[in-house]
Amino acid sequence: MNPIPSWPGRGRVTLVLLAVVPVALAYPWQSTRDYVLLGVAAAVVIGLFGFWRGLYFTTIARRGLAILRRRRRIAEPATCTRTTVLVWVGPPASDTNVLPLTLIARYLDRYGIRADTIRITSRVTASGDCRTWVGLTVVADDNLAALQARSARIPLQETAQVAARRLADHLREIGWEAGTAAPDEIPALVAADSRETWRGMRHTDSDYVAAYRVSADAELPDTLPAIRSRPAQETWIALEIAYAAGSSTRYTVAAACALRTDWRPGGTAPVAGLLPQHGNHVPALTALDPRSTRRLDGHTDAPADLLTRLHWPTPTAGAHRAPLTNAVSRT
């Protein structure tokens, strides 16, 4: 079934009205000029409201042109006001196999340090190896008082590292293996010489990576296992948590995934609840990288008890201390 895009924005509706209203006021149409204006108005309506596979025609055209303009991967923009620090999570010492998402989410505002987002990312390979990271993105503007209290030079990176170490300590106290992770310990999603196509990133004829936005709704606890069950060389899944605007108690969530396969991705989503990032794979995969400071697309208010209903896979023992033999080199 062809998915329906979101409700048209004000700009799109305004442009359509600018084309339709003059034609409607000219009724009845009698001259050739009137019919030309009618045809132009019809073309504008189709061009702005028409869609295919959940994307407006104008979005398809814009993304197609963006692919042509991009000659290499988008580099993460350098910034001194945002930083992301990572904590790797290993298997628990006890029999529990449920990652404590509600506990992790409380580190959005902990010990006087407020995180813009917390993201849990897992990478699962075809051999069953699972690795999990928790990323805390800290923004200087949200933490000026805490930063100035530590030093006059605003030590953003050091402050974020403090939050990461405290989270790792907390996880170890309740029985999980955990520790801070260096950026170069994270395997790359995409090879530097990959080429973007409409359906994904192509490295070789047997190496494709496709990005998908995941609907963060009440069905998410069923969607994530369905993604993990899909055959793939690598499966990347990320869940991002943030505070709702103006609130310190309500959460918004967003989710995304990427599948590395040895066949060309199909034109439709492989699992219900996924939206292919057609023509937008480079920006989507750049944001999906655990080291990214960008937010994932699609933040929505978290359904009630969502975090308690989500089952996150348990990493395998020693995975985070193993050499990255299969990691793709980065630029």
Curated annotation (Swiss-Prot):
Keywords linked to the UniProt accession: Cell inner membrane, Cell membrane, Membrane, Transmembrane, Transmembrane helix, Transport
Superkingdom to which the source organism belongs: Bacteria
Membrane-spanning ranges: 11-31, 37-57
One GO cellular component term: plasma membrane
Membrane topology category: Multi-pass membrane protein
This protein's encoding gene: eccE3
Similarity-based family: Belongs to the EccE family.
Keyword Chloroplast (UniProt): no
Organism per entry: Mycobacterium tuberculosis (strain CDC 1551 / Oshkosh)
Protein name from the UniProt record: ESX-3 secretion system protein EccE3
Function text: Part of the ESX-3 specialized secretion system, which is important for iron and zinc uptake or homeostasis.
Localization, UniProt: Cell inner membrane
Subunit architecture: Part of the ESX-3 / type VII secretion system (T7SS), which is composed of cytosolic and membrane components. The ESX-3 membrane complex is composed of EccB3, EccC3, EccD3 and EccE3.
